[in-house]
């Protein structure tokens, strides 16, 4: 169990991560590119539903099927450099989505992977504040509209692969704008986040008895 100073430092870092999607104030960098695993790709950019500029990759395959990938917090389209000391504290290991994209490509899927607002190379939205899906759903809508209007993807069979923050964002988007999902044939949502449970378990792990109340005051 950490001492009081260590617990407070961990708590402060957790609040910053939760509210801004950054680690110690830094966005996670994009360390890898699809060509590292032998994939051709193109850089793409398109607007969110509310106009925030989003950047990503389009990885083409010889098929009429498309997967749109929505990443987790505090990662990006590449994954997360948790193996680097300055981005540690989340398990200490790297998350690398590129082998996953390679497997999807080899299975016959085109892939659209992009950075959610305030992550990666995408623009800042809402003053840099993270909404755990309540704001980022607009980016999911933006990606759907982009895929629906892009000449080579508009007639493709479309599937969503959404992780953590991406899953929450997808769920909120689907709830608010179900008509935007008319062309979605399947959806995989990995680890959608229940905010209260995560906060309660975190403050318990650092021995902060009044941690949930402190967290609630810190973010409101």
Outline where the language-model segments fall:
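N-terminal targeting or regulatory segments adjacent to alpha/beta-hydrolase or S9 domains
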Residues: 1-36
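N-terminal cap/lid segment of alpha/beta-hydrolase-fold proteins
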Residues: 25-66
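Short, surface-exposed "cap/lid" segments of acyl-processing enzymes
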Residues: 61-107, 111-113
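Short beta-to-alpha linker loops that shape the active-site pocket of alpha/beta-hydrolase fold enzymes
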Residues: 73, 115-119, 193
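Alpha/beta-hydrolase active-site loop
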Residues: 96-100, 129-151
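Alpha/beta-hydrolase fold nucleophile elbow
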Residues: 152-164
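Glycine-rich nucleophile elbow surrounding the catalytic serine of serine-hydrolase chemistry
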Residues: 162-172
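Hydrolase active-site cap/lid region
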Residues: 172-220
